[in-house]
A protein has these predicted regions:
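Conserved core of the PLP fold type I
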Residues: 64-154
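N-terminal "arm"/small-domain region of PLP-dependent enzymes with the aminotransferase-like
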Residues: 2-65, 150
């Protein structure tokens, strides 16, 4: 018996377009007949990790264990360093993760999410995933039109 999992997904999720990464270095070299390519897309580091990072990873004894899911010690240190309360810190696997958590927690199909025309690519993705309406505000020159954004809030 087979199951089509896509048929079980919400309309917001099933309507998402899969992320298509840029071409690989090898593909660019082949297509453009280049010997060297430095890929700067996708927030990739062409230099690799620094020796300090490699040393820190090597020194970590518990790397094969799940980390503290609440990040208690990290939150405690961040709170102390930045003079914040621990409960005011949210940890995530990058901004994508945090934006997705916030959207799932607070945005419903009855909401409209307002964002600028040239803002972070994750805003439309998480908005669509929860089935909310998009409020895309055209750019003002090369910047955000904050007045138009404010007047669009309903």
């Amino acid at each position: 018996m087979s199951c089509d999992l896509f048929s079980l997904a919400t309309s917001g999720v099933s309507g998402l377009t899969p992320y298509r990464p840029g071409k690989s270095i090898e593909q660019l070299q082949r297509e453009m007949n280049l010997d060297e390519v430095v890929k700067l897309a996708s927030n990739e580091n062409p230099l690799g990790p620094s020796q300090i990072v490699l040393d820190a990873i090597s020194a970590t004894k518990d790397l094969s264990r799940y980390p503290d899911g609440d990040g208690f010690n990290l939150k405690k240190r961040l709170a102390k360093k930045h003079n914040l309360k621990v409960e005011n810190i949210t940890l995530g696997n990058g901004s994508n993760d945090i934006l997705e958590m916030v959207t799932r927690a607070f945005v419903t199909t009855n909401h409209e999410v307002i964002y600028s025309q040239h803002s972070f690519a994750v805003y439309p993705l998480v908005t669509q995933a929860v089935g909310a309406k998009h409020g895309v505000i055209p750019a003002n020159g090369w910047g955000h039109d904050l007045e138009a954004m404010l007047s669009s809030v309903n």
